[in-house]
């Protein structure tokens, strides 16, 4: 078998299924561990989560009228279909704090709204501070789905400048992600995932590409997916505000520069005109030839002929 097929079937072998059974057997122990070691700052959120888990356990163990609630299952499937995932399975977070939906949203009734709020209250979000190199969202979803059903998943791509620099010097052309957030349908599954994988190897087959990668994952108590989308929208707004401020400052600098250039041209033209007017006041003297005439009635001074110059004498000497 090729290396790619081994990577795709890392977590589908019988050994992994046995490991999965062991992990879910430890679920009750880890949940009790969380109840015993909560901090003072997170007591209020943990109490609410415990109540939600009890309500969730009651609904799971005691279905209404001895039948499964197929409406919840259908609603979850519809919500998963409406999630805007890209080709890699990464949830697309829009600026308005929600996922992209092509169809028009229908108004929810009071019952549907209460049901949706209850579903959101049951969810839990984990933060992944480091994503294994070149791991795609679809692969991460298949790895973490061992612990429970995953609703949405978002991985932050690396900076484009870093990617272009790596490719320019002959590096790997695959996409790389820096951090991510994973939303579990049940917060107990999110706690179990964080307690099991945090600080440990990803595991699987030894031939796996991600076998030795250390996972750093943390459960975020009281944190919902809406908080993440609002935070991203806020960061985008701050970035747009900074960009608009820089553009306005640059426009002011350009206007001041153009006005200064026009003023300098105007001053230069004024000074040039002043110089021309000053030059016109200068009185110039021109040498003129004396007036002579051959008229008989003219004065003797005017009848005198001009004396030959040196140039004329030289020419006459050469001729004669």
From Swiss-Prot:
One of its GO terms (cellular component) is nucleolus. One of its GO terms (molecular function) is RNA binding. Residues 1-10, 57-71, 276-285, 296-309 have a biased composition (Basic and acidic residues). InterPro entries: ABT1/Esf2, ABT1/ESF2_RRM, Nucleotide-bd_a/b_plait_sf, RBD_domain_sf. GO terms for biological process: endonucleolytic cleavage in 5'-ETS of tricistronic rRNA transcript (SSU-rRNA, 5.8S rRNA, LSU-rRNA); endonucleolytic cleavage in ITS1 to separate SSU-rRNA from 5.8S rRNA and LSU-rRNA from tricistronic rRNA transcript (SSU-rRNA, 5.8S rRNA, LSU-rRNA); endonucleolytic cleavage to generate mature 5'-end of SSU-rRNA from (SSU-rRNA, 5.8S rRNA, LSU-rRNA); small-subunit processome assembly. The keyword Plastid does not apply. Residues 27-39 have a biased composition (Polar residues). Residues 40-56, 73-90 have a biased composition (Acidic residues). The keyword Phosphoprotein does not apply. It is found in: Nucleus, Nucleolus. Transmembrane segments: none annotated. Residues 1-98, 272-309 are annotated as: Disordered. Disulfide bonds: none annotated. Residues 124-214 form the RRM domain. Keywords: Nucleus, Ribosome biogenesis, RNA-binding, rRNA processing. CDD domains: RRM_ABT1_like. Involved in the small subunit (SSU) processome assembly and function, and in the 18S rRNA synthesis. Required for the early cleavages at sites A0, A1 and A2. Belongs to the ESF2/ABP1 family. This is Pre-rRNA-processing protein ESF2. The lineage of its organism: Eukaryota, Fungi, Dikarya, Ascomycota, Saccharomycotina. The gene is ESF2.
């Amino acid at each position: 078998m090729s290396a790619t097929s081994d990577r795709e079937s890392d977590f589908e072998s019988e050994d992994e299924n046995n490991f999965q059974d062991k992990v879910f057997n430890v679920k009750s122990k880890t949940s009790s561990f969380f109840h015993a070691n909560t901090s003072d700052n997170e007591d209020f959120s943990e109490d609410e989560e415990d109540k939600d888990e009890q309500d969730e356990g009651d609904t799971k163990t005691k279905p209404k009228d001895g039948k499964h609630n197929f409406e919840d299952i259908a609603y979850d499937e519809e919500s998963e279909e409406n999630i805007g995932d890209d080709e890699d399975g990464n949830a697309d977070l829009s600026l308005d704090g929600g996922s992209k939906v092509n169809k028009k949203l229908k108004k929810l009734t009071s019952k549907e709204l209460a049901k949706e709020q209850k579903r959101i209250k049951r969810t839990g979000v984990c933060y992944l501070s480091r994503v294994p190199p070149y791991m795609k969202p679809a692969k991460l979803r298949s790895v973490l789905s061992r612990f429970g059903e995953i609703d949405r998943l978002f991985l932050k791509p690396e900076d484009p400048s870093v990617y272009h620099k790596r490719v320019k010097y002959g590096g790997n052309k695959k996409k790389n992600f820096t951090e991510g957030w994973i939303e579990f349908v049940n917060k107990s599954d999110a706690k179990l995932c964080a307690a099991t994988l945090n600080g440990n190897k990803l595991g699987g087959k030894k031939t796996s590409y991600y076998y030795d990668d250390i996972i750093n994952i943390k459960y975020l108590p009281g944190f919902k997916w809406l908080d993440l989308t609002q935070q991203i929208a806020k960061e985008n707004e701050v970035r747009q505000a900074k960009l608009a401020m820089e553009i306005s400052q640059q426009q002011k600098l350009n206007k001041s520069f153009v006005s200064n250039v026009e003023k300098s041209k105007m001053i230069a033209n004024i000074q040039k005109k002043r110089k021309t007017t000053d030059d016109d006041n200068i009185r110039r003297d021109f040498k003129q030839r004396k007036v002579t005439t051959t008229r008989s009635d003219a004065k003797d001074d005017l009848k005198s002929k001009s004396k030959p110059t040196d140039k004329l004498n030289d020419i006459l000497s050469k001729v004669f």
